[in-house]
């Protein structure tokens, strides 16, 4: 019943928005007007009513003046529910919300909640009208007075309610069915959209547009999360979850291949993806998939920790406040989730690392250095941590290892406010002790760093469980000088070797060692004010201590060879007074990389019995083969006897340690400058021709090295020789002094070499310093003397005599280790065989046999040459045949050796000769070399545990059917636990290719896997003939592509590189031989193999399809290698033909004449679009790529329609193709059909 409010004499009653429903009614205050007998009737033409979803009807009837029974209203009255009133007439809602008795009564009768009726939608209809009729008649029987309720049952009303109820029930059932159908359609539509996004994720697209792909996947996963939460189970749920996991694998693969900058930019997105999948879909994943996600999270956390540790304090502060901004940003984005789904997810929970120490006073020496690598963020063991005085050390910090993980604060303000409570203490991380920005002039600054630089590592205490108090120095040993110690920090024999090798440091023995001396003592200007500070104390070592020290020093060199380089250069420069040494105060620069020092420490030379020469802090031998260039007096020296094979072992060690050679090379270059100021040096390239050009192979040449008796006595008594720099103060003043890291050193070094060359050219050929004495024993013949050599040096031309080389040394003069000698030490090591005799000085001469393969070939007819001796002066052995071998041996291939030293040239030449012999044999049989990759090229393998049970049954049936065929393709290896499927057409390919090529099998798997596959493909052993190469170890997985990617090379492959063809599915594993490679499409038969490479969609096994043998990949590859073979042997001169040129020519024919423009493939504004893989592939196969359309463009390669370039191509009838068209053309070595890859509008 609608009643006008009291207090209104004339009230405008308007219900709904229909203008026809507005009438004027006169009412008295507080009552329904009797004079005008107003009744409200509801007239409608429809006989049905609208009910809510539940089918319930409110029985509250709007009563009229006659109870709805008179006035022609029979049949037109309807039952009004509160839902209809609320939805149809908004003005009525306040009354319903206030708890109107009609609504309360209706709900009480039906035992329903009050608020259930507020959710019904009502559609307004034209037929529903409210008409107010005025009547002058008196009140009829049954008419209600004000405040009364009609309790008399009206039969007509009851019948009306009963009919309406039945109608509502029928309509409600139909509506429920419609809603169910709509819900199913909506669900199916959402599933289809999600699946489309997940299936469209490809590896190439992720590499080109990582952020866009991640955004789409985030949106799809959010929608999938809602579906999973709203529906307990729905079709395709498991499929969508598996697709989500496959997409995550693809994204993770691309993320792991990024550089550090890209990882830092995309780590948030990656973390959100991992968290979303792990939190909401892990219950639908298998155990292995969960483990893989956990591994992804751990890798991401480790990379995040490393990035956090390397950031500056300001960056860390920004990262601390970032979650706060992220929360506010998230709150805004939650309201517009439909426009940007990915932004509504929570940020990743990365561990927060401490910033710079809040209590530490940082000075210039403790700030990070831009020239040093970032200090490691990994914590040290609690036993060696540093604590601040006054703060307790917890038991947990003393016993636990690993990074200290702080709980993540979800509230940004709370996280910032509690920061000082967390990180107020000194951190347990090693980064507390920050490195110095510049290299210290005092190598021993407390950190024991190798190379004269300040290390960021904390010195481990020799007392387990003890803590070093930061800011307090520990007492040093009495014999320890923090400012005058040598670079490698002389180590006492009591220091455990492992204690030093762990940190690549060496320090004096003490129960606790100093952390860092005062900053004042590290001032480099103090060295100028106190020249005596450069003196250092030499410690005595036993042979065992020397060996242990060598191990520590070598490990330090391996840790940071860059520091070693700086240290050596630092010791070389400087004035003479700074490098003065006395007999009792001679430096022992242990571990500076000198080859003599290292070999002696390893036991080849004894310290007690071998006199040493000190030159700029680096030790050398008094009995060196290389004397100075100013030798004029021949004197004999009694040298201490050593083991018979010491020199041979020494040279071999030199050959395998290039660091030693590099250090000696630098020393020789630096020493030549002051010496040439007062002496005329002998041209090392002239003297180098003696052993390289005149000593023939198979010749044993005893090399005696006599030295001065006085020199021997001096060295035996004191063990130290005076530095040659003391005898040349004038030359020292002319040397250029530069800091160790001064980049002008490189320019200066090249200037010295050019100056040396010009000076050597001006040297007279009859200089007395270049003369030597020659004596012959046995048969003597004249050698061919180069024009540069003194004609008075009577040397045998055929080189079949032995040479006895007498070393001539000046007393107190250090031998000149020239550049050419150090560059050719490996050549000498290959030619030298040492035999020493103990006894008198004449019997203790060093016998050196010089051998070369070239000389063996030139003089095979002199078997008695070993009985002949030739002695020449030591000045003629200053260099070991390097330049002469380059000029006389390399010949027309000299250009191939540019950039290699003579050590590498010898090895390359030896390998080259061997390969040329193999190649000539192949050419004689009209064959080339063919390298075949196994995995995903010739076959596809899968382990038993990777194959699903439903696929297992299919494979078993196929294998039974395959056994009846003459050539099988499917195998089940029980002993290896794996399935193997051969690529269609492989038997025909191997049979025909073996007639044209020497076949080689190559795999990244282990030997067991390679052997089994070779037996499978070549049961008789006639195709490969044992040429099987495996790069993996025994502990590696069977399928090599699951391992960490490695590179492949042609080691073990017959012939030269110019005659080798490679067939592989991966280009990146052949970085040095891409020009020899025929790239083929991966053969992925098993579903697990597709997932390994992040590919979506069903596999060949699931599709029950396979490649066509006559048109597949192997058939196309066979046609290519047959063409290469035909073109190769059509040339008359096979030595000038290269398969790489033939292959490149065949590739350029594939897409010749095509002009390609890429649309939505290469990011807009890319500075170097030609580096995109598709761009490079298209140009490699003959196409011309451009960034702008023109009339010559023939193809537009795109992923979608709608761009200007695509519209331009469609209007002009040009090809609009998918990127797969380029890939297909490259794989099949023929232009693919554009219609198969067309993108139609």
UniProtKB/Swiss-Prot annotation:
Q: Which GO terms describe its biological process?
A: defense response; negative regulation of abscisic acid-activated signaling pathway; negative regulation of post-transcriptional gene silencing by regulatory ncRNA; response to salt stress
Signal sequence segment? none
| One Pfam family hit | BRCT
Q: Gene3D superfamilies attached here?
A: BRCT domain, HAD superfamily/HAD-like
Q: What's noted on cofactor binding?
A: Binds Mg(2+), Co(2+) or Mn(2+).
Catalyzed reactions per annotation: O-phospho-L-seryl-[protein] + H2O = L-seryl-[protein] + phosphate; O-phospho-L-threonyl-[protein] + H2O = L-threonyl-[protein] + phosphate
Output compositional bias ranges, type Basic and acidic residues.
677-686
Q: What happens when the gene is disrupted?
A: Grows more slowly and flower earlier than wild-type plants. ABA hyperactivation of stress-inducible genes.
Q: Which residues form the FCP1 homology domain?
A: 923-1103
Partners and quaternary state? Interacts with RAP74.
State the function annotated in the UniProt record.
Completely dephosphorylates 'Ser-2', and partially 'Ser-5' and 'Ser-7' of the heptad repeats YSPTSPS in the C-terminal domain (CTD) of the largest RNA polymerase II subunit (RPB1). Involved in defense response. Acts as a negative regulator of immune gene expression and immunity to pathogen infections. Preferentially dephosphorylates 'Ser-2' of RNA polymerase II CTD. This counterregulates the MAP kinase (MAPK) or cyclin-dependent kinase C (CDKC)-mediated phosphorylation of CTD in response to pathogens and upon perception of microbe-associated molecular patterns (MAMPs).
The protein's matches in PANTHER family, at most eight in alphabetical order, are given as: RNA POLYMERASE II C-TERMINAL DOMAIN PHOSPHATASE-LIKE 3, RNA POLYMERASE II CTD PHOSPHATASE
Listed name of the protein: RNA polymerase II C-terminal domain phosphatase-like 3
Q: Which organism is it from?
A: Arabidopsis thaliana
């Amino acid at each position: 019943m609608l009643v006008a409010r009291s207090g209104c004499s004339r009230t405008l009653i308007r219900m709904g928005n229909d203008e026809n429903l507005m009438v004027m009614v006169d009412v008295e205050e507080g009552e329904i007007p009797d004079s005008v007998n107003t009744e409200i009737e509801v007239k409608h033409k429809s006989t049905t009513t609208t009910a809510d979803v539940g089918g319930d009807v409110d029985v509250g009837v709007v009563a009229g003046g006659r109870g709805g029974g008179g006035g022609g209203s029979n049949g037109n009255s309807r039952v009004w529910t509160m839902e209809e009133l609320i939805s149809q007439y908004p003005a009525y809602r306040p009354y319903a919300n206030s708890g109107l008795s009609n609504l309360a009564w209706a709900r009480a009768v039906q035992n329903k909640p009050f608020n259930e009726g507020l959710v019904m939608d009502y559609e307004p209809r034209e037929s529903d009208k409210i008409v107010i009729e005025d009547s002058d008649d008196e009140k009829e029987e049954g008419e209600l007075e004000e405040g009364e309720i009609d309790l008399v049952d009206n039969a007509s009303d009851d019948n009306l309610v009963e009919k309406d109820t039945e109608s509502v029930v029928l309509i409600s059932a139909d509506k429920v069915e419609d809603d169910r159908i709509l819900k199913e359609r909506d669900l199916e539509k959402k599933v289809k959209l999600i699946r489309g996004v997940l299936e469209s994720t490809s590896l190439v697209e992720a590499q080109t547009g990582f952020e866009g792909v991640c955004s789409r996947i985030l949106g799809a996963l959010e929608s999938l999360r809602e579906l999973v939460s709203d529906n307990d189970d729905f079709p395709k749920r498991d499929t969508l979850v598996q697709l989500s996991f496959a997409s995550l694998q693809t994204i993770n693969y691309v993320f792991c291949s990024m550089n550090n900058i890209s990882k830092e930019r995309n780590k948030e997105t990656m973390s959100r993806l991992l968290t979303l999948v792990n939190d909401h879909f892990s219950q639908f994943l298998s155990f292995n998939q969960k483990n893989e996600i956990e591994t992804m999270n751990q890798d991401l956390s480790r990379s995040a920790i490393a990035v956090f540790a390397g950031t500056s304090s300001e960056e860390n502060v920004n990262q601390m406040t970032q979650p706060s901004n992220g929360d506010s940003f998230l709150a805004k984005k939650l309201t517009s989730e439909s426009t940007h789904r990915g932004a509504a997810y929570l940020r990743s929970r990365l561990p927060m690392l401490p910033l710079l120490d809040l209590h530490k006073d940082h000075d210039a020496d403790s700030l990070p250095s831009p020239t040093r690598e970032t200090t490691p963020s990994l914590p040290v063991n609690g036993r060696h941590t540093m604590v601040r005085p006054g703060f307790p050390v917890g038991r947990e910090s003393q016993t636990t290892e690993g990074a200290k993980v702080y709980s993540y604060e979800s509230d940004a303000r709370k996280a910032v406010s509690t920061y000082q409570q967390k990180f107020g203490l000194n951190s347990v991380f090693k980064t507390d002790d920050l490195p110095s920005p510049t290299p210290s002039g005092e190598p021993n600054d407390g950190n024991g760093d190798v190379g004269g630089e300040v290390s960021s590592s904390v010195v481990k205490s020799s007392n387990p469980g003890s803590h070093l108090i930061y800011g307090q120095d520990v007492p040093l040993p009495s014999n320890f000088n923090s400012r005058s110690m040598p670079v490698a920090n002389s180590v006492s024999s009591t220091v455990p070797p492992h204690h030093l090798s762990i940190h690549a440091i060496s320090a004096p023995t003490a129960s606790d060692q100093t952390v860092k001396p005062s900053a004042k003592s590290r001032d480099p200007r103090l060295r100028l004010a106190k020249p005596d500070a450069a003196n250092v104390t030499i410690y005595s070592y036993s042979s065992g201590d020397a060996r242990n020290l060598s191990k520590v020093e070598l490990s330090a060199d391996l840790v940071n060879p860059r520091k070693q380089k700086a240290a050596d250069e630092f010791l070389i420069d400087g004035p003479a007074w700074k490098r003065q040494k006395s007999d009792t105060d001679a430096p022992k620069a242990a571990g500076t990389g000198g080859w003599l020092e290292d070999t002696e420490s390893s036991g080849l030379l004894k310290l007690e019995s071998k006199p040493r020469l000190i030159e700029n802090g680096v030790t050398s031998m008094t009995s060196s083969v290389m004397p100075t260039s100013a030798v004029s007096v021949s004197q004999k020296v009694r040298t201490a006897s050593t083991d018979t094979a010491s020199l041979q072992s020494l040279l071999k060690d030199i050959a395998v340690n290039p660091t030693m050679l590099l250090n000696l090379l630098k020393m020789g270059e630096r020493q030549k400058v002051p010496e040439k100021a007062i002496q005329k040096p002998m041209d090392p390239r002239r003297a180098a021709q003696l052993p390289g050009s005149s000593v023939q192979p198979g010749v044993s040449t005893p090399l005696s090295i006599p030295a001065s008796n006085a020199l021997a006595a001096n060295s035996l008594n004191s063990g130290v020789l005076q530095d040659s720099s003391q005898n040349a103060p004038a030359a020292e003043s002319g040397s250029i002094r530069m800091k160790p890291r001064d980049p002008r050193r490189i320019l200066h070094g090249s200037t010295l070499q050019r100056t040396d060359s010009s000076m050597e050219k001006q040297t007279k050929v009859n200089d007395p310093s270049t003369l030597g004495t020659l004596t012959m024993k046995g048969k003597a013949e004249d050698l061919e003397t180069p024009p540069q050599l003194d004609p008075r040096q009577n040397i045998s031309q055929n080189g079949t005599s032995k040479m006895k080389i007498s070393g001539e040394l000046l007393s107190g003069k250090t031998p000149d280790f020239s550049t050419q000698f150090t560059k050719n030490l490996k050549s000498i090591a290959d030619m030298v065989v040492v035999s020493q005799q103990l006894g008198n000085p004449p019997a203790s001469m060093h016998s050196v046999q010089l051998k070369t393969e070239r000389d063996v070939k030139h003089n095979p007819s002199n078997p008695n040459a070993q009985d002949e001796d030739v002695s020449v002066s030591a000045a003629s052995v200053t260099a070991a045949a390097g330049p002469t071998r380059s000029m006389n041996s390399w010949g027309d291939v000299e250009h191939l050796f540019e950039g290699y030293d003579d050590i590498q040239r010898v090895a390359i030449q030896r390998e080259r000769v061997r390969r040329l012999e193999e190649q000539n044999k192949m050419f004689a049989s009209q064959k080339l070399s063919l390298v075949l990759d196994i995995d995903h090229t010739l076959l596809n393998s899968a382990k038993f545990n990777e194959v699903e049970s439903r696929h297992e049954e299919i494979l078993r049936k196929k294998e039974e059917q395959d056994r009846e065929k003459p050539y099988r393709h499917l195998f089940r290896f029980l002993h290896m636990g794996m399935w193997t499927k051969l690529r269609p057409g492989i038997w025909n390919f191997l049979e025909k290719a073996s007639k044209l090529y020497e076949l080689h099998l190559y795999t990244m798997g282990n030997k067991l896997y390679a052997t089994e596959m070779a037996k499978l493909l070549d049961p008789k052993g006639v195709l490969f003939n044992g040429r099987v190469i495996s790069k993996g170890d025994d502990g590696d997985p069977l399928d090599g592509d699951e391992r960490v990617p490695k590179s492949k090379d042609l080691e073990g492959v017959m012939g030269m590189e110019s005659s080798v063809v490679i067939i592989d599915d991966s280009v990146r594993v052949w970085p040095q031989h891409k020009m020899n490679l025929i790239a083929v499409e991966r053969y992925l038969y098993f579903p697990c193999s597709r997932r390994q490479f992040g590919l979506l969609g069903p596999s060949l096994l699931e599709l029950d399809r396979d490649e066509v043998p006559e048109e597949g990949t192997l058939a196309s590859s066979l046609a290519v290698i047959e063409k290469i073979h035909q073109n190769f042997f059509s040339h008359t001169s096979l030595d000038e033909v290269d398969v790489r040129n033939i292959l490149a020519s065949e590739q350029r024919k594939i897409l010749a004449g095509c002009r390609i423009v890429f649309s939505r493939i290469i990011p807009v504004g890319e500075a170097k679009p030609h580096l995109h893989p598709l761009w490079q592939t298209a140009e490699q196969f003959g196409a011309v790529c451009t960034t702008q359309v023109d009339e010559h463009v023939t193809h537009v390669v795109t992923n979608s329609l709608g761009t200007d370039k695509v519209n331009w191509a469609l209007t002009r009838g040009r090809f609009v193709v998918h990127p797969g068209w380029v890939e297909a053309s490259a794989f099949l070595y023929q232009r693919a059909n554009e219609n198969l890859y067309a993108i139609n509008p």
